[in-house]
Amino acid sequence: MLRYIASRAAGMLVVLAIVAVLVFVLTRAASGDPVSVLLGDQATAADIARVQKEYGLDKPLPVQFGYWLREVLQGNLGTSIFLQRPVTQALWERSEPTTLLALMAVAIAALIGVPCGIVSAVFRGRVVDQLFTGIAMLGASIPSFWLGIVLIQIFAVSFGWFPVSGYGAPDAPFAERLHALVLPATVLGLLNSALIIRFTRASMLDVLGEDYVRTARSKGLSESVVVLKHALRNALVPIVTVIGLTVALMIGGAVITETVFGLPGVGNLVVSAVLRRDYPVIQGALLVIAAIYVLINFSIDLLYAVVDPRVKV
């Protein structure tokens, strides 16, 4: 078991190292100069050179990468060029909306996707199966910004049940902040439920064809007991896997939704940083998102090793 954990941990570190290199290279490959954006068109060449030296942007790229990587290994993601404060602080200040949005969205996606996938598998080939399969295909093809605009128009503008945008003041009650996240979480939840529906359906179909399920039915057990106690229990591990990965994908994919709804989350911070060419924020945010994704994937691998005897450790 320890060898299995060590090999997975080593693989995780390799992935993060590759991500760090790619993030740095792609950020620097983008056109534009953060110092020019910061100082404006009236800045002189001397002013630009002075600020570039202050942030180490006058050094060769390999040297810049070495400095940045050394700071990252010490837990320092750098200082934002525009916000003038540590990137870790900026990310922490924006983490609450994004985290709550992802958790609410995955709860909605799971509450919709798992039951629909189970029903679709049980009634394979029937009208309800075709209906849920069609809904899953539709959900996978609808752009999040379009669905967000539609929900805003209906539930925020027409009915006035939810705010059009924003997250509330920092000192606003927690319930008020959650209320502001209902529409964006619904957008992400509905769209990501499509993946969970398809995955749950496929997992349940694999299990429903097993001998022990047929044996349970031959014993006269009710269909609900067969499906929920025998089939779902054995199909649950891969379903939990896709739900866990959905959490990571939502954290990284909330950029568009946060922009549409004007949420002050990490996604909105990244968009602003990209427009300003704020290298430290872009690099730090993407590296943290990648680390969260890799850690969730690592945890799921360990879960597999514990509960699934077919996984060799």
Question: What do the predicted segments below correspond to?
Answer:
Residues 2-4, 16, 91-128, 144, ...:
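Alpha-helical transmembrane segments of integral membrane proteins
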Residues 6-12:
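N-terminal signal-anchor/signal peptide hydrophobic helix marking the start
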Residues 15-66, 83, 159-180:
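Hydrophobic alpha-helical transmembrane segments of membrane transport/permease proteins
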Residues 22-29, 59, 70, 134-165, ...:
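Membrane-water interface segments at the C-terminal ends of transmembrane alpha-helices
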Residues 23, 27, 31, 35, ...:
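Membrane-water interface at transmembrane helix exits
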Residues 43-76, 213, 262-273:
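Short hydrophobic, aromatic-rich alpha-helical segments embedded in or entering the lipid bilayer
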Residues 58-114:
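An internal, D/E-rich "acidic patch" concept
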